[in-house]
């Protein structure tokens, strides 16, 4: 029996999701375990893990060899825990006796910069600058009048700041949970001091895209894509995420509603419907394959796009470890597809290796 290891920074992270996979794993001839990078012993090359027993629906502790296949669901922050985990995961990616069912993407700047080199994808990427100096922000804001600062390593909308240049002041608006906060700077000196403090962390700078609908709710579209057994990318689901009224973003962690794509789509003008469908097709037929070629093999992607007030379609973000909540909320019928695809991927990789004469190791 082959072993698939669900790796996260905490055994409790995505517990419900891993349990759904674990329940279905025996159907695919897979033993399913959970572990963290810190559970690996560098001396023995063995891992302490929780293994799922379907007969009793329980997790039991065990020690075994590093699993044959790894499903990487590690989400990194700025904390020391994350920083300690990263080199272990990088070592695992090079370990010859295991295989990741999908690789991750590098930082946002690297991904966006590479996508800008692709002739089909380039028109969908907002102008993006890797910012390290106040002068860059001042120049960009003077030109655009409104721009967005995004953390280079952020997720879920955390740390995003809207800058607006007024006649007499500059404002910086951001979310703290559900609440929107605004700082006002009456002169360049105070704004410069604030910028230098913010830029102690890595940020990207983009023009502000107004993505509010007619009721003033920010909306974006999550395209959830997975690679099938044949290596082809499929759009498993589409959901429209709606943030707080008058908010900046639609993907605030824990704070967005999910609408069906069809109900939202019917509400936009007919001319925009045609353009949107054409652009979605172009994006889904180019972005996954290009990223796969650059950084792969990948397995799943969350493509976040928007229809801005100016009528243009933009790519807002790309995530190689996407969540499933918004898709499941609007398309519960996709549950089995979402919960079996990682197992099918693992089974496919094993089948490929078996044809080459590579057999799973004893644990």
Curated annotation (Swiss-Prot):
Gene Ontology biological process terms in this record: sporulation resulting in formation of a cellular spore
Gene Ontology molecular-function annotations: ATP binding; catalytic activity
InterPro entries xref list: ATP_grasp_subdomain_1 (IPR013815), YheC/D (IPR026838)
Subcellular location: Forespore outer membrane; Spore coat
Described function: Involved in sporulation.
Name of this protein: Endospore coat-associated protein YheC
Bilayer disposition of the protein: Peripheral membrane protein
Cellular component, GO annotation: membrane
Sorted UniProt keywords: Membrane, Sporulation
Keyword presence, Membrane: yes
Species the sequence originates in: Bacillus subtilis (strain 168)
Family classification: Belongs to the YheC/YheD family.
Alphabetized Pfam families for the sequence: ATPgrasp_YheCD
